[in-house]
C-alpha cells in the first residue's frame, strides 16, 4: 500500500498535513499554516525535497529521543518526525519518508 498525505484543518482553523506510510503510521508532520494553499505548497515541498539526504536534519530531544526534521532548500523546516526510541529507528523513519513521499497521494480532509 502506498503512502499518502492527509491534509487537515484544526479546530482553530489552521491547516496542516501528515505523511502516512503504507501501513498507516504517521512518519512526518507539518507545522500549522494560516492558509490551505500554504499547506498544499508544503506538501509539494516535501515531495520535492524528500529524496535529498542533505535536507534531513537529525537531532536528539532534551529527553534523549532521536528525531528528524525535513528542510526545504531555504533551510525552513517543512516537516518533523515523531520521537524515536533509537537512532536506528529514526534512520528507518527517514528511509520511509524518502520511499513514500515522492509518489504519495493527497487526501484532502478539510471539507
List the predicted regions and their residue ranges:
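Glycine-rich beta-strand-turn "strand-cap" elements at beta-sheet edges
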Residues: 98-111
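A structural feature that tracks compact, well-ordered secondary-structure segments
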Residues: 6-8, 14-22, 27-33, 42-46, ...
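Charged, low-complexity amphipathic helices and coil/IDR segments
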Residues: 1-3, 103
